Amino acid sequence: MRIFFALELMPSAMLEITTWRDRSFRGLTAGGTAHPVPPGNFHITLAFMGDVAEHKREVLCDRVSQSLDQAPIETVSLTIDELGYWQRQGILWLGPSRCPPELQQLANRLKGLGSRVGGKQDNKLFRAHITLFRRCKLPPPPPLEPPDFSLHHRDFVLLESCQGKRGVSYHTLQRWPLSA
């Protein structure tokens, strides 16, 4: 079971970002030069765990709950104001130009808890982002209107990644509140 921790986006934020993306990068999908991520798949990955057996997933969920009981993490507000392109991965993304410390703390904690139960060991630095396009062969021109979205998160989730006939979909396995 491929799992990861993430911040989900509210439907209104998904709609706003989709409208901006479609207006800003109209021609990007022509000729298969890029594949847009379905709005329902927009999220911010906090920590990718990879394939984790169900019994280990249960242990992981218990440890996350215990960790939050002992040291709660505050709700997270983000200003999504930066557009980026990772050429090697072919990913066009949106993210905050400044990552709040509580978000970095949450991502680091989840990564550490996951590694203790056999989750994927990842040495990459955390970079909060929402993937807009995959398989983007060339960097797109800058948008006419810069991104500027406000996101507020009161919880985070553990998602399962499922590959189907229509591509990838994500299913919520568990949800944890952040403290107000």
Q: What are the language-model segments listed below?
A:
Residues 1-180:
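Histidine-dependent nucleotide/RNA phosphoesterase domain, centered on the 2H-phosphoesterase fold
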